[in-house]
Amino acid sequence: MPYNTYIHMNTKSYHFFLLPLIFLLSSCSDEAISQPKIEFTSSVEKLVEHTKEFIPKVYSYDNGIHVAVGFGIANSIMVEGEGGNIIIDAADSVYEAEKIYSYFKEINSNPIKAVIYTHNHGDHTFGAAYYYNLSEEKPKIIAHETTAYYMERILGILNPIISVRSSRMFGTFLPEEQLINVGIGPFLGVSQSVPGYIKPDITFADELKLSIAGIDIELHHAIGETNDQLFVWLPQRKALMPGDNIYKTFPNLYTIRGTTHRDVKGWVDSLDHMRSLDPEFLFPSHTKPLEGDEVMATLTIYRDAIQYVHDQTIRLMNQGLYPDQIIELIELPKEIADSPFLNEFYGTIRWSVKSIFNGYLGWFNGNIAELDPLSRKDEALRLSDMVGGIENIYLQLEMAVETNDMQWALQLSDHLIALDYKIKDVNKLRSQAADYIGQRSSNPNKRNYLLSSALELQPGFELENILTSDSLLLEQLSMDNFFNILSVRLNPDAVEADPYRVCFKFDSGLIKTITLRNKIAEISSITTNCDLNIELADDLFKEVLAGLHNPIRKVAAGDINTNGKSAEFLIFLSKFRD
């Protein structure tokens, strides 16, 4: 955890890692500070007004396209065909998918022939298992060829940090009265059921044309909010499904939950590709559909805004300015600034500038003072000496909170935490500062992240994992993914000086080896000089690592063959726990 985060995550002792994404629930003791109700500043009132965009409703069109809006963070789309239907984006959970389909089947109860993922995010994929399990005849699962890779990374090596940061950004553990909306939807609902991701069985690289249930479909790779993003084009119906490359708010060119660099220029190019088709209907995966002249006008304004931020960031970068300077100089031109599609209810220009800079030039901004700076603790010590003692920093923190200078209060609290000074009191003041700023923020990502962080800092707060994986989800994930997770979970202090090799033989015939040396775990298929030979089923291996089974019991039952070295195997597994 970061040095300034104090969260207790309760997990059973034998859980080595947890796969579910964003399945977190909070609990607070009676001593926790009560949360104030929403403060309706003018900017927050605009966010409240934006909630009308997400009133639950199925929008139906004469061309046989139906869009479920407001049932979860993402829309789900049904396209009627001949004797069967297609689902585009499967909602954020099996629970939400079932609720949405109860409306869809009233319109047309023909079987679902295919589910198309526009990209890898859980709010578009985690409901797929509902449709997959509706009948014996399984629907085709269609996506870009890299979607499974990105799903495995989020459900694998990055899961712990992405889960926590995502839960903050979407406010998943905020009291109901604190959550206004999440900018592109009313709420994130994935915590209501086990994730229902199904691995795609039809994939493509650049373009795919096919016919399903008499529906002519074109799928086009369209880099934007994700690298695996695609858009769906139905040429006979002049209907465009752009995924997350456009919605009714300024785009998330960077997301504060954390992401790989988003190719902003590629995003513009993708929108231009969509414009070249001259669509008459636009069915985004967030916010309401559009039709008629509004479609092309909105696509044009949206791509112009993205290009403007991109181009002006590059222009000022080339003048030698740093990110903190550039963010003060870029705002949208008046010609497009008032567009309702560019309100900063999801992404912001300031965050976008920083991400564009980093995407082109990396973490070093060019300022020599920041090339190899003092540690935060050393800086805090010198600041303490400069102001006559650490207690004076604390007095300044109290004064900042008293005068509502809350951003300064947050930054001062960083120094005090680095010096481990009055942590309980500092956290209380830090919580007040975060809550104050969050209450007045109209950007839901910023608002929810700050309010969630304020809640975390309160006494007695805990995060608990409330859902685990199930066997169906684990079947979708490759064995390589599980070994990659083990590699990054290795505790280097538990590795002995001499190399140590464990060889796994699985019932599928797969052979994998983990060699511990030099504080790393090398994953290979080398089977010579094994110190430990383990035999077990592929599924059991996944289920043990996901926490569905206690390895001690499985070894004792003989389900895991350790060839007489049970204790040694359990000691080996313990090296991958923090």
What feature does the model see in each segment?
Residues I55-N108, F231-D244:
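Conserved beta-strand hairpin/beta-sheet module of binuclear metal-dependent hydrolase folds
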Residues L24-S27:
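C-terminal motif of bacterial Sec signal peptides marking the signal peptidase cleavage site
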Residues G64, V79, D89, F104, ...:
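Divalent metal-coordination and catalytic microenvironments
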